[in-house]
Amino acid sequence: MEMSKASKQTTRHEESEHVQNPEPDQILSPRRSLELKQRKWWISVSLCLFLVLLGDSLVMLLLNFFYVQMKQDRREEYDQDLQYKGTWTQALIQNAAFPILIPLFFIFPKPKQHLETNNTSFLSLRLFFLYLSLGVLVAAHSKLFALGKLVSNYGIFSLISTTQLIFTAVLTAIINRFKFTRWIIISILLTIVIYVLGTPDFGGQPHDGEEFGYNIQAWLAFSATIAFSLSLCLIQLGFEKLQVKTKRYGNEKVFRMVLEMQICVAFVASVVCLVGLFASDEYKELKGDSKRFKKGETYYVLSLVGLALSWQVWAVGMIGLVHYVSGLFGDVVHMCASPFVALFVVLAFDFMDDVFSWPRIGALIGTVLALGSYFYTLHKRNKKKMAELNQSENNVEV
């Protein structure tokens, strides 16, 4: 009895201390708290946008470097089987560097858990199956993306890939109940035009006469775009309906949630790609590829490591945009990066007839308009929240 009374007194004492010492956000006025929250949100969105642009640029530069070094030996004589080799390796590289994110996951501060714990075990189980299904989906996209670029003309592949944004818009409207505004629709239309005009050249595409049939090219491109669009919508659904409701991070959106999503999904995708690598006996070609690499084995390893790290930079930025804004916005930013990537590719490589032409310059200008249209919508939403808060405060005063 005495022990139970003592424990009750201790619990009451802790609760009273919690009331007397509230969180910093609770000390601030609601208006000031919302201003700080929106400022942090804008900083997070800007950081993720920069990571996507940086990751896209590094990935395409390193992919071009890799295939330029491999192209002379692997493409001298057309061999249909050679078109498939290396695709499981490239798919694995897209996901395998996730362990570098684990230290960052523990470095970022973890907010206090919410006191409510109802149905958290059920939600955690659903979250586990979401990570599992997303990992398989990302692995499928990685394989199709790597294969589609090698067996088809990159111009055709990129042209079909413009439908990716349309698929994302349709799926997010169905799965995420996304509400469109006229400015978002304008941003989508501009982004499609930008992607068509500003697509960079790719050193791994086959020479004339090497392409597969157009039906295979189209199906590979469509499958890759649908898998990517669906993964964005499911990631957004996981953030909104599952990860937030587990209350492990309180009621706030924190960057730690982004890292958790990427680590878990990339782990599953890496396992799937690793199984594919060994099941297809593609791992036996790695030693031969390193010897055929014109710059030598050291540069071969460094290029693969650089690619793996660049893919993680891109993935963290992309999932961050999905987390803080939406999957549709993440796809818009990803596709708007194409003119910047094209500029870097032109400066770094000497491809035949590949120049930063006037259409690409127009696409670069259009990128500002497309992102500006979407950012205007985000600004209006934040402004509306502030106006609603002011109105509620005025009603309380009255």
Curated annotation (Swiss-Prot):
Keywords: Membrane, Phosphoprotein, Transmembrane, Transmembrane helix, Transport. It comes from the Eukaryota. The keyword Electron transport does not apply. It is a multi-pass membrane protein. It is found in: Membrane. Residues 11-20 have a biased composition (Basic and acidic residues). This is Probable purine permease 17. It comes from Arabidopsis thaliana.
